[in-house]
């Protein structure tokens, strides 16, 4: 806006006076307006001192092709992969292990998760490292036959059966409580299908799937926080598309999140610029909230400033700590 005003004012003066000095002053003013803020920003960046308690995080980057691999593996196979990638990497000082969105994509019946083999396997990992907190993406289904339970975000399976489809993040640690957060900013047309009765017969499943099954997802109306087993850390479980919205992410901070996590399936973008732009949004959220971000995806971790402390190569299986 400032540059626009300077240029507009200079053009008006030049048209009146036809004095080339005006153009020289315009060039000088524009250069100062651009370079001065950049210079000040670099000075501030080089003098930033990080304070507060540090958190030891491992972010998983499994490099799973969502088009050919993700839905052809069972949840227990993904636990095997998790154990393989984290073997000898998790220590007693590791606070969090973070996996991508819907890492466990084989839908789990919500009431049965507590007693499932998946929960048992994850508990076993935590049992070896009592200080560990696992934040992972899980696809949940809650199936019911009570029509009165069906809400505007419920899906009807047949004449007597409905289900809620959740794209969730869960926290597993040494406490018996399981914290669950359901993705609440949905991809329109994929996870949030408006006017289904009209559009579904026309479009069918022609829309690309960016985060699980093409069905209406069930959301929640508050920004849940995951508290570590020792009570020192309060993580914001931001799921994929939610990180695009600054005010939405600020809601986690208002609920006392002292660091942010982003779990995402941005491999859906393949070789396009989509996953790069998604990563750039994460950096903006770090600047806005003054919070460090641990990001589990194809692109790894942007911190609470303008540069990446640690970044994994895209399309490689690895861990970032």
Placement of each model-derived feature along the sequence:
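Soluble catalytic regions of membrane-associated enzymes that act on cell-envelope
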Residues: 42-190, 227-232, 237, 241, ...
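Short beta-strand scaffold segments in enzyme catalytic cores
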Residues: 167-171, 224-226, 301-307
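A short, polar/charged loop-to-alpha-helix boundary motif
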Residues: 187-199, 316-321
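Short, solvent-exposed cationic patches
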Residues: 196-213
């Amino acid at each position: 806006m400032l540059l626009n005003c300077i240029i507009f004012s200079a053009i008006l003066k030049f048209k009146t006076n036809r004095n080339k000095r005006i153009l020289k002053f315009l060039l000088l003013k524009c250069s100062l307006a651009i370079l001065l803020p950049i210079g000040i920003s670099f000075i501030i960046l080089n003098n930033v001192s990080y304070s507060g308690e540090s958190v030891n995080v491992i972010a998983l980057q499994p490099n799973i092709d969502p088009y050919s691999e993700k839905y052809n593996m069972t949840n227990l196979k993904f636990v095997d992969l998790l154990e393989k990638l984290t073997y000898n990497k998790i220590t007693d000082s590791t606070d969090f292990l973070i996996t991508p969105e819907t890492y466990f994509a084989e839908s789990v019946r919500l009431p049965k998760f507590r007693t499932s083999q998946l929960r048992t396997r994850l508990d076993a990992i935590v049992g070896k490292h009592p200080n560990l907190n696992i934040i992972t993406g899980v696809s949940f289904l809650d199936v019911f036959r009570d029509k009165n339970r069906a809400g505007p975000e419920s899906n009807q399976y047949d004449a007597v059966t409905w289900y809620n489809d959740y794209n969730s993040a869960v926290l597993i640690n040494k406490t018996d409580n399981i914290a669950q957060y359901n993705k609440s900013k949905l991809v329109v047309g994929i996870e949030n299908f408006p006017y289904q009765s009209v559009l579904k017969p026309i479009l069918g499943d022609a829309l690309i799937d960016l985060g699980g099954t093409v069905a209406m997802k069930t959301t929640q109306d508050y920004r849940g926080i995951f508290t570590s087993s020792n009570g020192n850390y309060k993580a914001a479980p931001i799921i994929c598309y939610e990180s695009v919205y600054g005010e939405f992410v600020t809601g986690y901070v208002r609920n006392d999140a002292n660091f942010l996590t982003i779990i995402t399936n941005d491999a859906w973008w393949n070789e396009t610029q989509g996953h790069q732009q998604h990563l750039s949004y994460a950096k903006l959220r770090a600047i806005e909230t003054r919070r460090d971000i641990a990001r589990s995806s194809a692109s790894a971790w942007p911190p609470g400033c303008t540069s990446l402390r640690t970044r994994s190569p895209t399309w490689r299986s690895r861990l970032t700590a």
